[in-house]
Amino acid sequence: MSSAGIATLSPLLDQFCFAPHGEPRLQQLDSIVIFLAMPGVAPMPMRVLHSDSVASVKLRIQQFKGFVTTKQRLVFSGHELSLNNSHVRDYGLTDGNVLHLVVRLADLRAISIETANGKKFQFQVESCCNVGYLKDKLSAESGQQLGSLKDQRLVFDGEELEDNQLIADISKKGAAVIHLFIRRPAKVQTQQGDKETVVTVVTPKDNDNLQTDALNLAKPAKGKPAPVEPIIANGKVKLSPAVMEMIYSTISGIENGYLPVMSTEGSGGVYFMKDSSGESNVAVFKPIDEEPMAKNNPRGLPLSTDGEGLKRGTRVGEGALREVAAYILDHPVYGCKSCDVPGFSGVPPTALVRCFHMGKGSNKVGSLQLFVDNNGSCEDMGPRAFPVKEVQKIAILDIRLANADRHAGNILVCQDGEDHLKLIPIDHGYCLPEKFEDCTFEWLYWPQAREPFGPETAAYIGSLDADKDIALLKFHGWALSPQCARVLRISTMLLKKGAERGLTPYDIGSILCRQTVKKESEIEAIIEEAEDAILPGTSEETFLETISEIMDFHLDKLAVKLKKF
């Protein structure tokens, strides 16, 4: 399974290597100089053309720095450059602008070092680095606090590690505990997880009290609140057995001393929660104050200036609510969620929880989602092997919720039996937006999306009811804004009407997604046409009836066109 993180580029030695198409051409009228910004690195100049596509910019970053295009996320003015075929000018990039670059790398190891007195050291070290490099980083960061290199001795599994040993060689041995002995004396204990290394510096006198990690979570004293507890706005809400079991397992892990481990994946704070044995991940916690562009975001993204999230139509701090909403609205074909029946699209059990900072007396609120063992993501393999029904179940969810961030990296691939592959959708913090502007579905270009819905799938679509969904979310404590409610009603309407006419997920999804940043999607055109057709003060019900009539006209026209081919 691949891991991810914020990569670090060294400053450019020669800005000519980033000239458009590998040529100097420094004085072209169409060219501008932008700066790539990453945490801990000075902004790096890069010359591009106004007519360059986002894909070509990513390709040049790959060509000169080796970062594969599919691993790159470019952010400008608080929004992601998500449409690869759009020009940089479409996003408003001008001379001197700063472009934030997030890169996911398979061999990047995040290392956190924390002393008993609260002093923290954080590093990002590639697997190809050796133990000596880690010592250098630690000494440079700590100064005289941890002594010189000659005072440090790393011991793993009873044997001293040599300075020339690679981090990758140690990682191959699985979960590892490394001890760093210092003359004073002190030691550093390092726990190696799937994607994260957590190092704790312990002095003898403070050893019994050290119970903190990146989240500052600690084992609670008697009489104190549980380290994790669900947030239930309505006392009538009954959490599913799967959600309760996930919460209990998370609490057991923390109480046994296995603290959350920060993942290097994603553009926000993501933490793996361990089970009671500490050997397996049981859940994934995403604090709202560490979301992209939130005040405590650990990835170096700028703070939102207007409250809007990374995707247009979303708000910073609402990602956890959207994660939970996706689970609530993923209805089973039969039965109900409270009976522990899985949803049609397979969204893992998710709940809004409060994680306590026992040391600080405060807490973090966020989404807690069941960790799903997997064989990687759809990003790691070609889509042709995926069953049609598995792809289409995710397409239905994304169309309904107008997902603004569906890519291959947030669809997990699991083995269901010997030959059958099962897809699990995750990361729904950008669903249910207030507008359709940023809807993106990577499955749109997979062959399964061009297959018609089967009878069972079509029947499920026919049973969907947006008004009931809105009422259900309100019952659980989230009253959708009028804009979000309108988007949900329109997207559900489109899905149902499209399926009735025999349209494929590709046909329907294409109506929701823009082809370029500047060119509005067909659904946006339908909404504008409806707005022009009604009088000021018209009720929402009348407006939706107008949308329905215009949508019928467009879909009938499309259905006739498709029958000719």
Curated annotation (Swiss-Prot):
Keywords, alphabetical: ATP-binding, Endoplasmic reticulum, Flowering, Kinase, Nucleotide-binding, Nucleus, Repeat, Transferase
Effect of disrupting the coding gene: Early flowering phenotype under long day conditions.
Please write the reaction equations for the catalytic activity of this protein: a 1,2-diacyl-sn-glycero-3-phospho-(1D-myo-inositol) + ATP = a 1,2-diacyl-sn-glycero-3-phospho-(1D-myo-inositol 4-phosphate) + ADP + H(+)
Q: Where is this region: Catalytic loop?
A: 402-410
Region spans: Disordered: 291-311
Extract one GO BP annotation from the record.
Answer: flower development
Q: What is its main location?
A: nucleus
Question: Where in or outside the cell is it found?
Answer: Nucleus; Endoplasmic reticulum
PROSITE patterns in alphabetical order:
PI3_4_KINASE_3, UBIQUITIN_2
Extract the CDD domains matched here.
Answer: Ubl_ubiquitin_like
Annotated ranges, domain PI3K/PI4K catalytic: 257-542
Describe the location of the Ubiquitin-like domain by residue ranges: 32-104, 109-187
Q: Name one GO molecular function term.
A: ATP binding
Q: Where does ATP bind?
A: T264, E265, G266, S267, G268, G269, V270, K286, Q369, L370, F371, V372, D427
Task: Give the enzyme's main class according to its UniProt record, as a single word.
Answer: transferase
Quaternary structure? Answer: Interacts with FTIP1 and RPN10.
Please give the function described in this protein's UniProt entry.
The phosphorylation of phosphatidylinositol (PI) to PI4P is the first committed step in the generation of phosphatidylinositol 4,5-bisphosphate (PIP2), a precursor of the second messenger inositol 1,4,5-trisphosphate (InsP3). Involved in the control of flowering under long day conditions by promoting degradation of FTIP1. Recruits FTIP1 for degradation by the 26S proteasome in leaves, which affects RFT1 transport to the shoot apical meristem (SAM).
- Name the family the entry cites: Belongs to the PI3/PI4-kinase family. Type II PI4K subfamily.
Can you name this protein?
Phosphatidylinositol 4-kinase gamma 4
